[in-house]
UniProtKB/Swiss-Prot annotation:
It comes from the Bacteria. Belongs to the ATPase gamma chain family. InterPro entries: ATP_synth_F1_ATPase_gsu, ATP_synth_F1_gsu, ATP_synth_F1_gsu_CS. This is ATP synthase gamma chain. The lineage of its organism: Bacteria, Pseudomonadati, Pseudomonadota, Gammaproteobacteria, Enterobacterales. One of its GO terms (molecular function) is ATP binding. It comes from Buchnera aphidicola subsp. Schlechtendalia chinensis. It is a peripheral membrane protein.
Length: 290
């Protein structure tokens, strides 16, 4: 009887867990769709800025900006886009391992690294080791807007602008589809003029008033800020997709476990019935002997 009760309690406990994981799966689906729409809606804006910069640079070949100038690398900075919450599979760990590889590559060249981390998971991971965390922030709002992340972006860029670091990398999870997301590390600064090539031959009839150099300064800043924010949106979409899959797997595993426990419960129940029948028959036989 105690075995049946124990199995029944396990079934009830797992059923309650299954309800939670199923609810979290549905919430993640809704959040992922919302985040994906936001991510895709920002992409054309980034492409347009890139196109405008391409045309201006094409007409100002000798123009040099702080973000276009290469300098001797003494120290690098890495912007780490992580999550505030867990239960999203190996999303963070895969990215962190790639970041550590980059740090070690530059360490072998006697180049130190500074980390600018967004998300509490990244902070807790790198704080447990001896890595230099220069600046960090948590994602404090559910709907993380462009203006919410400006303080983090400006704090990171300030170190490059004041030449405290000579290269700035951006690390995040790139969203491909619901099942595929890739940990990516890209060099954010200095920018290569190669990334702005490809659009210069298209039709263009804008007139810049008055100084295109001033406009280019503004656009380059806007491009960098938008690039970082785009990576934040992609990482958020990856987070929800990964959590959705993790919760679906947990729900499916719960269902499988419940099925196995029900088989055990029915078997224990049948054993009890068989034992009771055996006892009744044995008792009846004993009475008939008298």
């Amino acid at each position: 009887m105690s075995e049946k009760k124990e199995i029944k309690n396990k079934i009830n406990c797992i059923s309650n867990t299954k309800k939670i994981t199923k609810a979290m799966e549905m919430v993640s689906i809704a959040k992922m769709k919302k985040s994906e729409i936001k991510m895709k809606s920002r992409k054309p804006y980034l492409d347009i800025i890139k196109t405008i910069i391409s045309h201006i640079l094409y007409n100002h070949i000798k123009y040099r900006h702080l973000y276009l100038n290469n300098r001797k690398t003494k120290k690098i900075g890495i912007i780490v886009i992580s999550t505030d919450r867990g239960l999203c599979g190996s999303l963070n760990i895969s990215l962190f391992k790639k970041i550590i590889q980059l740090i070690n590559i530059y360490k072998n060249k006697n180049v130190m690294s500074s980390l600018f981390i967004l998300g509490s998971k990244g902070v807790s991971y790198f704080k447990s080791s001896t890595y230099d965390i220069t600046y960090y922030e948590k994602i404090i709002t559910k709907n993380y807007t462009f203006f919410d992340c400006l303080n983090f972006i400006h704090s990171s860029l300030e170190y490059y602008n004041t030449q405290k670091i000579d290269k700035l990398f951006l690390s995040y999870n790139q969203f491909k589809n619901t099942l595929v997301y890739i940990p990516v590390i890209m060099q954010l600064l200095p920018l290569s003029k190669k990334i702005f090539k490809g659009n210069k031959n298209s039709h263009w009839d804008y007139i810049y008033e008055s100084n295109s150099g001033i406009l280019l300064d503004t656009l380059l800043n806007d491009y960098i800020e938008s690039q970082i924010y785009q990576s934040i949106l992609e990482n958020c979409t990856c987070e929800q997709a990964s959590r959705m899959i993790s919760m679906k797997q947990a729900t499916d595993n719960s269902e499988d476990l419940i099925k196995k426990l029900r088989i055990l419960y029915n078997k224990a129940r049948q054993d009890n019935i068989t034992q009771e029948l055996t006892e009744i028959i044995s008792g009846a036989n004993a009475v008939s002997l008298y």
